[in-house]
Amino acid sequence: MPKKPSRKTIVNNLDKVFSEYIRRRYAKNGIAECVTCAKKDHWKNLQAGHFMSRKHYATRWDEENVEVQCMACNVYRYGEQYLFAKHLGEDKADELLAKSRTMVKLKDWELQDMIEIYKKKLLELEQ
């Protein structure tokens, strides 16, 4: 019987498939654009930037909370929060802020289900 994956492994796997989905969802012919500075590059060279930090499970895998960002904006400019909020609009930014403050406890099987959902979504993007 295979060893049950650790919680950390499950979360990392979900982060990986979710990030790829976000970046590929916005790509046209493999090229995506940074939401904050408009830099265009291949989706593999860009990142999935979070408006509300990944530490908040309530919004960590919320598709409205995550957009394509270049490494400069996402890492070195701390996500360019002001420009990100401007892109989202005040109401959506406030909604995500409130949602991020809610307590969410996801079970391992729920995270595994989300992995399968995003794998299916990636397959749909390929068609």
Features from the language model and the residues they span:
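Short metal-coordination and nucleic-acid-contact micro-motifs, chiefly zinc-binding Cys/His arrays
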Residues: 15, 25-33, 62-66
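A boundary/linker detector
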Residues: 1-21, 26, 38-40, 96-127
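Residue-level detector of alpha-helix boundaries and kinks
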Residues: 3-7, 55, 73
